[in-house]
């Protein structure tokens, strides 16, 4: 036989038959080897044809294997290694297969021709086929359903058989099987799609919208309407096939193979005479799909059929990809009619989630409160700005349910703690058992008593946990059963099987509903007691997930955080000394935000800190970050002195398209996208170019900036602090006796500020805060703070440092300069105190656990070790 006259799959089967013969030590390849080789290919055509005939594949395989085992095997020195003979029976089989191919007017011998030849085989194989009721007529019937009217004209025809089933999925069948979630709302879009599909020509809608707004769901909604027969007469018996472009392209190694597969799909649709609607999700993938040198891409192959109305196609793609790929090909674009899928409102999202609630409850085995659904819609809309409803709200509910589900399946915390304590005591018991002294024996008795008590508690808790788990699983199983019965009822009513429908509606379903109600009431009754497991998803869980995703504290305040916020002003005052007004205004803004009464469309607070250098402007920003986030690293600090040139603006929001660094994004926008809840410090703003402030206008007023890539960056959860030295000379000169700023000095500073910044910029800032120069009393407090920081650095060596009052006075006099603020003081302490301590430490005079006193002698600081 000429192998070139066979298809690739037939050649592969003959090679596999040879391998089987070698592995069984047979000297010749027979028909039974070929039969088993065909059956062992899982997704092969032979298996598909036998499945269509309802043949038991495993029984057929076992029969073939037992026939192979009967064949004589040759091993040992007499065996001719590497020599295989083809039996005359196999040669005759292949000749018969060739004749079958001629009868069917095929150019190549394919797997189906070999199967038809097998049906005429005599002997053992004939007996096996007769036992399993395999006849030539049955084979031909099944072959026609798989192959249709296609002829074998290439060496890989199997790829074109049942093309739709292989490269797509039937959405209508999936709806009938209950695999698709219900689609709530979207009626206007579904009606528009139905209107376009009912046209004579150009009846191809394309759904365009942002990712996550529910484009695919609209098509699933149409499939559900087709199942319910809630569509016009022309669409009643239609089915929707979702085409899988990746499956179509995958494995197409040779030129023309991809086109052949796609053509087979299109031919099947054409033969259906409008019964099949083709749904292509991610429609832009057809542009350029399968395009190689001289080949035609999928888009161009679809155009003629789309224009003639032979192909009913529904597309779905995002706005950006539609513009980028489809609009570039006007001939393809004009064949589609756009249907814009808008993002649903928060109210619509709540309705969608209420419709999906039952499916989530059945899948996860939890109860979802209605408050959780409302919270998911509202919080996702407010805090997750880079994604779209309803997708982000559905994800929130799903993750919250999954959190509760994993808690149900894992050991409760209370039981886990008791179990660990038991393990710890058992280890201690084993160690004490080896000791003989009286004290150890007494301790052992006490320990054994505690251990037996704990084991009793643990066994009680474990039994309670198992019972609660069992109850939850029972409710979940009943819900699943009820869901199945409701699906069966829909199917029975659709098929007018009235007996079955009546039995379900009036018999089985009410019985299960009653049982479910009793189980839920029992669970509600048990809830009054102290339960180990939670099975409710409430708004707290949703808020917790939002906080985890974004880092923004949305969850209800726990007691510790409540106290911390009420003490925020005091905490800030401990580190920022002498600036009561600034501390008070900043802490008030944070309190308003966490209480939830701030304007949701503006930042938490925006402040300009004015004052001389070294009075605590930057320190307050750092302290605020430390207090709110337990880390100064959470502060986004931008030194505005780096933005002196006009073109430096692009570094804040990203370089424009075509410039180097376009892909990298801006320093400010990227930092806030990563950490939406943070303190943004714009240091030394008067040094920046005036153009920079135009960028900040939207940030201060609407709490958002659009970066160079067109993404909206949300600043609504940031505290924006800008520092400046403008007018510091007036502040230094204009102090009252009590340390407050004179009114005329305040006016002079504000006048200078208005001269430097535009009114529209200053008008958008919440507060302009003047930092007053530090007085001598405040400087003493700063000395204490510096010494405290030094002690913190020496804490691991248990060395304490103390400055006498005289030493403090001396440091204040020698180190403080009103013009430069507290920074020279820090440098002085570093030079005069820290250096002396370092010398003594290296010399070994100061050892660990020492108490060091710094005093003044002969107008000089000295160190005494105690």
Curated annotation (Swiss-Prot):
Lineage: Bacteria, Bacillati, Bacillota, Bacilli, Bacillales
UniProt function note: Part of a stress-induced multi-chaperone system, it is involved in the recovery of the cell from heat-induced damage, in cooperation with DnaK, DnaJ and GrpE. Acts before DnaK, in the processing of protein aggregates. Protein binding stimulates the ATPase activity; ATP hydrolysis unfolds the denatured protein aggregates, which probably helps expose new hydrophobic binding sites on the surface of ClpB-bound aggregates, contributing to the solubilization and refolding of denatured protein aggregates by DnaK.
Subunit structure, as described in the record: Homohexamer. The oligomerization is ATP-dependent.
Lineage: superkingdom: Bacteria
One GO CC annotation: cytoplasm
Signal sequence range: none
Region described as NBD2: 561-773
Ranges where the record places region Repeat 1: 6-71
Pfam families membership: AAA, AAA_2, AAA_lid_9, Clp_N, ClpB_D2-small
Name used for this protein in its record: Chaperone protein ClpB
Family: Belongs to the ClpA/ClpB family.
Region (Linker): 344-551
Renumbered residue ranges of the record's region Repeat 2: 86-149
Residues that coordinate or bind ATP 2: 611-618
Residue segments, region C-terminal: 774-866
Gene3D superfamilies, alphabetized: 1.10.8.60, Clp, N-terminal domain, P-loop containing nucleotide triphosphate hydrolases
Entry-linked InterPro entries: AAA+_ATPase, ATPase_AAA_core, Chaperonin_ClpB, Clp_ATPase_C, Clp_N_dom_sf, Clp_R_dom, ClpA/B, ClpA/B_CS1
Positions contributing to ATP 1 binding: 209-216
Keywords for this protein: ATP-binding, Chaperone, Coiled coil, Cytoplasm, Nucleotide-binding, Repeat, Stress response
Any one GO BP annotation for this protein: protein refolding
Gene Ontology MF terms: ATP binding; ATP hydrolysis activity
Record note on domains: The Clp repeat (R) domain probably functions as a substrate-discriminating domain, recruiting aggregated proteins to the ClpB hexamer and/or stabilizing bound proteins. The NBD2 domain is responsible for oligomerization, whereas the NBD1 domain stabilizes the hexamer probably in an ATP-dependent manner. The movement of the coiled-coil domain is essential for ClpB ability to rescue proteins from an aggregated state, probably by pulling apart large aggregated proteins, which are bound between the coiled-coils motifs of adjacent ClpB subunits in the functional hexamer.
Coiled coil: 394-528
Broad class of where this protein is predominantly found: cytoplasm
Region (NBD1): 162-343
Domain Clp R: 3-149
Cell location: Cytoplasm
């Amino acid at each position: 036989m000429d192998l070139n006259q066979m298809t690739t799959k037939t050649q592969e089967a003959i090679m596999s038959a040879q391998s089987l013969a070698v592995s069984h030590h047979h000297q010749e390849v027979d028909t039974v080897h070929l039969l088993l080789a065909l059956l062992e290919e899982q997704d092969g055509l032979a298996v598909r044809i036998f499945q269509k005939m309802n043949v038991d594949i495993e029984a057929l395989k076992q029969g073939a294997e037992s026939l192979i085992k009967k064949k004589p095997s040759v091993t040992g020195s007499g065996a001719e290694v590497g020599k295989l003979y083809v039996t005359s029976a196999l040669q005759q089989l292949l000749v018969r297969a060739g004749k079958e191919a001629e009868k069917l007017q095929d150019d190549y011998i394919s797997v189906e021709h070999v199967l038809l030849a097998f049906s005429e085989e005599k002997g053992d194989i004939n007996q096996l086929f007769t036992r399993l009721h395999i006849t030539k007529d049955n084979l031909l019937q099944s072959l026609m359903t798989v192959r249709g009217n296609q002829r074998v004209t290439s060496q890989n025809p199997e790829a074109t058989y049942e093309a739709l089933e292989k490269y797509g999925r039937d959405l209508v069948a999936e709806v009938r099987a209950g695999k698709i979630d219900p689609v709530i709302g979207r009626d206007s879009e579904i009606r528009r799609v139905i209107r376009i599909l009912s046209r004579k020509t150009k009846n191809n809608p394309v759904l365009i919208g942002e990712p996550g707004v529910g484009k695919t769901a609209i098509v699933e909604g149409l499939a559900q309407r087709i199942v319910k027969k809630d569509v016009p007469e022309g669409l009643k018996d239609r089915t929707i096939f979702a085409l899988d472009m990746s499956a179509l392209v995958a494995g197409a190694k040779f030129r023309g193979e991809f086109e052949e597969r796609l053509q087979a799909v299109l031919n099947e649709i054409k033969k259906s005479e409008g019964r099949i609607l083709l749904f292509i999700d991610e429609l832009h993938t057809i542009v350029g799909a399968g395009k190689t040198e001289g080949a035609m891409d999928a888009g161009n192959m679809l155009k003629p059929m789309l224009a003639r109305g032979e192909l009913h196609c529904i597309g779905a793609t995002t706005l950006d990809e539609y513009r980028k790929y489809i609009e570039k090909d006007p001939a393809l674009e004009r064949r589609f009619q756009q249907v814009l899928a808008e993002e649903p409102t928060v109210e619509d999202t709540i309705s969608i989630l209420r419709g999906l609630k039952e499916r989530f409850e059945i899948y996860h085995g939890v109860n979802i409160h209605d408050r959780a659904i409302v919270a998911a819609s509202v919080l996702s809309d407010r805090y997750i700005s880079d994604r779209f409803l309803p997708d982000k709200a559905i994800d929130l509910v799903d993750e919250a349910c999954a959190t509760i589900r994993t808690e149900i399946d894992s050991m409760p915390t209370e039981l886990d703690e008791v179990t660990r304590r038991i393990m710890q005591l058992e280890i201690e018991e084993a160690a004490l058992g080896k000791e003989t002294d009286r004290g150890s024996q007494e301790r052992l008795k006490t320990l054994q008593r505690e251990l037996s008590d704990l084991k009793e508690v643990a066994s009680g808790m474990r039994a309670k946990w198992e019972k609660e788990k069992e109850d939850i699983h029972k409710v979940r199983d009943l819900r699943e059963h009820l869901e199945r019965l409701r699906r069966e009822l829909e199917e029975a009513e659709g098929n007018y099987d009235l007996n079955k429908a009546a039995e379900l509606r009036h018999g089985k379903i009410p019985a299960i509903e009653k049982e479910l109600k009793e189980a839920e009431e029992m669970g509600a009754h048990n809830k009054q007691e102290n339960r180990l497991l939670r099975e409710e998803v409430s708004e707290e869980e949703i808020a917790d997930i939002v906080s985890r995703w974004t880092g923004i504290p949305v969850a209800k305040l726990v007691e510790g955080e409540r106290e911390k916020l009420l003490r925020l002003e005091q905490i800030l005052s401990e580190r920022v000394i002498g600036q009561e007004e600034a501390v008070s205004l900043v802490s008030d803004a944070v309190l308003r935000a966490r209480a939830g009464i701030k304007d949701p469309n503006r930042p938490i607070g925006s402040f300009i800190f004015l004052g001389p250098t070294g009075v605590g402007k930057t320190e307050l920003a750092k302290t605020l970050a430390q207090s709110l986030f337990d880390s100064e690293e959470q502060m986004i600090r931008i030194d505005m002195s780096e933005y002196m040139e006009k073109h430096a603006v692009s570094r804040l929001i990203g370089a424009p398209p075509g410039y180097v660094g376009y892909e990298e994004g801006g320093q400010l926008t990227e930092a806030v996208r990563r950490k939406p809840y943070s303190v943004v410090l714009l240091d030394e703003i008067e040094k920046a170019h005036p153009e920079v402030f135009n960028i900040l206008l939207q940030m201060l007023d609407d709490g958002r900036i659009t970066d160079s890539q067109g993404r909206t960056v949300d600043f609504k959860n940031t505290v924006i602090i800008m520092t400046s030295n403008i007018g510091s000379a007036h502040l230094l000169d204009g102090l009252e006796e009590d340390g407050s700023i004179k009114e005329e000095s305040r006016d002079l500073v504000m006048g200078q500020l208005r001269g430097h910044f535009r009114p529209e910029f200053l008008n958008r800032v919440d507060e302009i805060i003047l930092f007053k120069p530090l007085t001598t009393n405040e400087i003493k407090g700063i000395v204490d703070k510096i010494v405290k920081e030094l002690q913190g650095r020496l804490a691991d060596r248990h060395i304490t440092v103390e400055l006498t009052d005289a030493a403090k006075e001396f440091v204040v006099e020698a180190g403080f300069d009103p013009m430069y603020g507290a920074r020279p003081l820090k440098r002085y302490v570093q030079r005069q105190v820290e250096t002396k301590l370092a010398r003594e430490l290296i010399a070994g005079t100061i050892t660990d656990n020492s108490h060091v006193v710094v005093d003044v002698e002969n107008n000089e600081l000295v160190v005494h070790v105690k």
